[in-house]
From Swiss-Prot:
Protein name from the UniProt record: Silk gland factor 1
GO molecular function list: DNA-binding transcription factor activity, RNA polymerase II-specific; protein domain specific binding; RNA polymerase II cis-regulatory region sequence-specific DNA binding
The organism's place on the tree of life at top rank: Eukaryota
Gene Ontology BP terms: anatomical structure morphogenesis; cell differentiation
Record function comment: Regulates the transcription of the sericin-1 gene via interaction with the SA site.
């Protein structure tokens, strides 16, 4: 009978073992028909043995909760905390969790760039000094002590600090006095700059301060530079012989006169050669001064471009002698000058 009941896979069931007398029951079977988690040669794992031993046959019926608890207690359900240290160390999740528990997670902003402009940093340094005056090196030191970010790349941001001090009217350079010897001048805030930052917040200025005196000087220098630029252009034109105040020489006078005559008369028949007898006679007639002639009323007056007064009169006489006499501006289209140029402007058919 015992051999038949134990022949199923060599695994004793709780029903067959419970039918045995207490004296014949093996020592590893308890009184409630449960087996503790002990190694068994024909089982795959200890957990399977525990599960199989705790499951009773249909003939046994429902076990009380206390019995089930005792059975589960003996089944070998090991909690996470009692795992071996080797298995816990092998898990990457547990290693990450242990690292977070060992070190308090807190993000540090000490080495981040502060959200302040260089003007704000300089104002902070000056206002935090009792004398309200600091040298350039003291401003550097204050910024580096307050913000560790500026302990690196010192040359770059220190150049920006010097630029801000020099080109902002809110900062004033104060020379040293005999009672304060040392190197370098002091820097302070302008008395009229007022409170540039709202409620002590240095993130943004309310308005940009401008010194009226410095602004006036800047405008005057700007106007002077503009005037000097135009004066230089006039001097450059004077080098080419157009705006010279000194009277030109004989050779230059003749050359400029020929050039102006060529510009006035585009028609080839009016440009006379200078070495012909007709040209000599023409130059003699230019010396005659007409009566009642007003050069400024000529429609083609170029008095501002001519080098000398004598040449101006000669050229105006030339216009009169060749039919370019006085004609008002409104009668220009009825004058012979317009018809003459209009005839030459039309292309030949």
């Amino acid at each position: 009978m015992i051999s038949q009941k134990l022949s199923y896979g060599d695994v004793p069931t709780s029903a067959s073992l419970s039918s045995l007398s207490p004296g014949l029951a093996p020592p590893y079977v308890n009184g409630m028909g449960c087996m503790p988690a002990q190694p068994y040669p024909n089982l795959y794992s200890n957990n399977m043995v525990a599960g199989g031993s705790c499951m009773g046959s249909p003939s046994v019926g429902y076990s009380p909760p206390s019995t089930m608890a005792s059975c589960m207690g003996g089944a070998g359900a090991v909690p996470y905390g009692s795992l071996p240290r080797e298995q816990e160390a092998a898990s990457p999740t547990s290693a990450l969790q242990r690292a977070r528990n060992d070190k308090t997670y807190r993000r540090s902003y000490t080495h981040a760039k502060p959200p302040y402009s260089y003007i704000s940093l300089i104002t902070m340094a000056i206002q935090n000094n009792p004398s309200r005056m600091l040298t350039l090196s003291e401003i550097y030191q204050f910024i580096m002590d307050l913000f560790p970010f500026y302990r690196q790349n010192q040359q770059r941001w220190q150049n920006s600090i010097r630029h801000s001090l020099s080109f902002n009217d809110c900062f004033v350079k104060v020379p040293r006095t005999p009672d304060k010897p040392g190197k370098g001048s002091f820097w302070t805030l302008h008395p009229d700059s007022g409170n540039m930052f709202e409620n002590g917040c240095f993130l943004r200025r309310q308005k940009r301060f401008k010194d009226e005196k410095k602004e006036t000087l800047r405008q005057a220098q700007k106007a002077q530079q503009t005037h000097g630029h135009h004066g230089g252009s006039h001097d450059k034109r004077g080098e080419h012989g157009h705006d010279k105040s000194a009277p030109p020489g004989p050779g230059e006078d003749k050359e400029m006169r020929d050039e102006l005559l060529a510009q006035l008369h585009a028609a080839p028949e009016l440009c006379l050669p200078e070495h012909t007898p007709l040209a000599l006679e023409h130059y003699a007639q230019l010396k005659q001064e007409p009566s009642g002639y007003a050069p400024a009323q000529h429609p083609f007056s170029i008095t501002r471009l001519l080098p000398g007064a004598d040449t101006k009169a000669d050229l105006k006489m030339y216009d009169v002698n060749y039919g370019y006499g006085h004609s008002p501006a409104d009668n220009y289209y009825q004058s012979p000058l317009y018809h003459h140029h209009h005839a030459h402007a039309q292309p030949p058919l």
